[in-house]
Design a protein with these regions (language model features):
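Hydrophobic alpha-helical bundle architecture
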Residues: 43-51
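Conserved helix-loop functional segments at active or binding sites
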Residues: 42, 113
Length: 117
């Protein structure tokens, strides 16, 4: 609890910093998930043919990881008052989601083509 304006400002500042920190981990998760989707495509193209479905599943799970981590970022942005910061993070998250979905689709199509034929 805060008993005066100074304490209230300090409390709000601490909450802002905590929310900013809480955003960094899911952004890192997104980065790793994007890389896994890329590696999944490499496995499908160059890996053991028996791993094709495993590579496809890894892309599926990684897409879910991107989306889930993105939701964590977005919920934490609600507690941040810096509009410029929030807009940059929203744009970054949208880019990551779009990239993940685009790359996932490539992996999905390649996976299905190899396991159906």
């Amino acid at each position: 609890p805060s008993s005066n304006n100074k304490q209230e400002k300090e409390k709000l500042n601490a909450i802002q910093k905590a929310n900013e920190f809480a955003i960094e981990i899911p952004l890192e998760v997104i980065s790793h998930c994007l890389r896994i989707i890329e590696l999944s495509e490499e496995l499908i193209d160059n890996g053991n043919p028996n791993l094709v479905s495993d590579a496809g599943v890894s892309a599926e799970v990684s897409l879910a990881g991107v989306r889930g981590a993105a939701m964590n970022v977005l919920i934490n942005l609600i507690g941040i008052d810096d509009d410029s910061y929030c807009n940059k993070k929203r744009e970054l998250v949208n880019k990551f989601i779009n990239d993940a979905e685009k790359n996932w689709k490539i992996v999905f199509d390649k996976t299905m083509k190899k396991i159906i034929l």
